[in-house]
Amino acid sequence: MTAHIITGGGTGIGAATARLLADAGDDVVIVGRRAEPLLAVAATHERIHAITADAADGVAMADVVASTTERFGGVAGLVANAGGHGYSTVGSTTDDEWRSSLEANLTTAFVAIRAALDELERSRGAIVVVSSIAGLAAGPETAGYTVGKHALIGLVRSVARDYGRRGVRINALCPGWVRTPMSDEEMSVLVQRGDAPDVESAYALVTRDVPLGRAADAGEIAATIAFLLGPASTYVHGATIVADGGSTIVDVPTLAYG
């Protein structure tokens, strides 16, 4: 018996993934810095177990892996989903903001992967690193976030190169807009600026040029993560999987033509 570990498991994609895996019969350990949302998610399913820890803290994540292994016999998979947003250009980003953004979006994944590697080798397990389409392109005034999400893809490729022959699979997942509490906050920025009258209208605005014409539900991204963790994807390794409703295939200069 083994379990999956999900960082950033208290809300959004992490919480949806925990529920999906638990519904499939897997034990799941969700990790985050805030106890309240973790406990709320854990209360929804007997197979979801909460541990409050900072995923960027090496000692804390080593303890999470040790506790998971002691209780469940090993680690079957890791979902590195912790992250955070921020708004600034390179010129307006302070040293502290830069460090904070990289810690939230890159260091958390590095530390979690490093902590879990030995157990994942033992179980021949899988890792999914949740990046973003911000890891493939750049939005405005999101310097730290954009750099961190790009760097995650490099991290995935490095681990894939070094640990594939040791039995560990790893892939990056780049979602587009997903309906999560963090995205709701970003929609609220558009509302406050007067670009949209409400959050729903803001989602419609940001997905106007997405070929599927909508944001994803967190469950749709969770299903992609479950696929990448599972036996149907055993030859998918070191890949960057994009789940964005088609937004990154759009030829932007042709938008004027409809």
Where are the regions a protein language model picked out?
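Alpha-helical segment proximal to the catalytic Tyr-Lys
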Residues: 118, 161-165, 234
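Active-site helix of classical SDR
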Residues: 113, 148, 156
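Residue(s) in the substrate-gating loop at a strand-loop-helix junction
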Residues: 132
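C-terminal substrate-recognition "lid" of short-chain dehydrogenase/reductases
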Residues: 110, 214-243, 248-249
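Short, small/polar-rich loop/turn modules that mediate ligand/substrate recognition or access, typified
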Residues: 79, 164, 169, 236-238
